[in-house]
Amino acid sequence: AERCVMELRGHRVGVDHIQRSGKRMGILYLETGSNMRPSKVFYDREYSSIAMIEPDSINWYEILKDAIWFNWTGITPALSQNAADECLKAIQVANELGVTVSCDINYRGNLWNYGKDASEVMPALVEGCDLIMGNEEDCEKVFGIKPKNFDADNTKGSINQSTFESVCQQMMARFPRCKKMAVTLRGAINANHNTWCGILYDGKQLYQS
């Protein structure tokens, strides 16, 4: 843990508010693919610090008092009820202080193991977001919002723009605070070769890199 803190400090990232708790740090393993076998990611988060966070152990007002932007990921509330509760508190404090809030839905079904589904927890969190990042699969599995006439070519890494725009419009209608939606689109050519692009919708126009 100390080595990770030192690495962050070396990049001039503030580490004053880092807390050490739980039994260990969460780990992500990447199994690199070969030829046409895709790469796989394995999340090892059980008993990690954030999964075992204690209620009210973080002073969000102190942490966010000088912040201009707060970003959270859907992986955090997936780990435990306490993690979900603290995530909600952080969002609420950020809203109160006028801090821009963004989220990456980042739905990982195998992480939701404490008795609640993402569809039960995520809506209350996303309600406080100004920018939402998520693809059409995230929106359908978590919020039940289905794209219209979906047509994506993963080989070329392209997407039917009107399809993604329809998802954005439905998300913004459900979560009025959200003013922008973004998604990254990866196209798999083979295990070691991918295309990558970003798409942003601002409520009026769709932009693609």
Describe every region a protein language model picked out:
Residues 206-209:
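Short pre-catalytic strand/loop immediately N-terminal to key active-site residues, enriched for Gly-Thr
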Residues 46-51, 78-80, 108-113, 157-160:
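Short, flexible loop segments at the rims of nucleotide/cofactor-binding pockets, characterized by
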Residues 46, 75, 106-110, 137, ...:
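Active-site beta-loop-alpha junctions enriched in small/polar residues
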Residues 97, 111-204:
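Conserved phosphate/ATP/ADP-binding segment of small-molecule kinases
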Residues 15, 101-102, 133:
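Hydrophobic beta-strand scaffold residues
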Residues 1-75:
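Conserved N-terminal subdomain of the carbohydrate kinase-like
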Residues 9, 88, 92-96, 126:
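Anion (oxyanion) recognition and catalysis
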Residues 51-59, 85-91, 116-121, 162-166:
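Active-site glycine-rich loop that binds ribose-phosphate moieties when present
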